[in-house]
């Protein structure tokens, strides 16, 4: 509940400020790239969040099974993220060949796609690490808000804004990744162990 409130309040605060400060054309560029990024994200995560939350919840009392499920899903998500990110960066010229600003925004927002490798919030939720999730989210949102107010001061600061948003997302995932390593461990996984997961993840 607390995280949902944060997710409502902070976008209102930042959105109002940014819409007032940034050039409307540049802000429109940001939103356009954000729309394109939202197309790539599902392919990077491959449905791991929903499936992983349920799968870890079912085996959370068994350490060995938890480690195996975590490792399977992490490696699969990592593979999907690498493939998707490669396609994302390889095709950016197709979208904005003659617009340098859009290209820069596109490249910087690619950081969010790369960061999906460390997106393991489904493990924290399954293990009910709710206090950690709330405080981590609150601190990152506050730092993001302060950074926007401090550095986005001119109508041309769209790249700075994009960088702040992308690094905030990456930091959120990376912190969770290192936090969860106290609860789960990587185990050796064979490719054949991943095949049974494909259909459930696509469902």
Predicted regions mapped to residue ranges:
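Residue-level recognition of pore/gate-forming positions within transmembrane alpha-helices
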Residues: 4, 8, 35-38, 81, ...
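Signature of the first transmembrane helix
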Residues: 1-49, 145, 199-203
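Membrane-water interface segments that mark the loop-to-transmembrane alpha-helix transition
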Residues: 1-7, 33, 38-42, 46-92
């Amino acid at each position: 509940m607390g995280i949902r409130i944060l997710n409502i309040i902070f976008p209102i605060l930042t959105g109002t400020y940014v819409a007032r400060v940034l050039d409307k054309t540049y802000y429109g560029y940001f939103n356009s790239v954000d729309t394109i990024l939202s197309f790539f994200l599902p392919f990077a995560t491959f449905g791991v969040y929903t499936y992983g939350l349920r799968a870890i919840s079912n085996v959370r009392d068994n350490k060995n099974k938890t480690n195996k499920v975590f490792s399977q899903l992490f490696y699969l998500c990592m593979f999907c993220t690498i493939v998707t990110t490669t396609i994302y960066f390889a095709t950016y010229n197709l979208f904005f060949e003659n617009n340098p600003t859009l290209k820069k925004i596109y490249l910087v927002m690619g950081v969010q796609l790369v960061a999906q490798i460390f997106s393991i919030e489904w493990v924290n939720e399954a293990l009910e690490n709710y206090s950690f999730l709330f405080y981590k989210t609150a601190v990152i949102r506050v730092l993001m808000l302060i950074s926007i107010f401090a550095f986005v001061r001119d109508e041309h600061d769209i790249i700075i804004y994009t960088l702040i948003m992308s690094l905030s997302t990456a930091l959120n995932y990376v912190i969770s990744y290192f936090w969860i390593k106290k609860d789960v461990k990587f185990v050796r996984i064979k490719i054949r162990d991943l095949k049974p997961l494909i259909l459930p993840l696509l469902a």
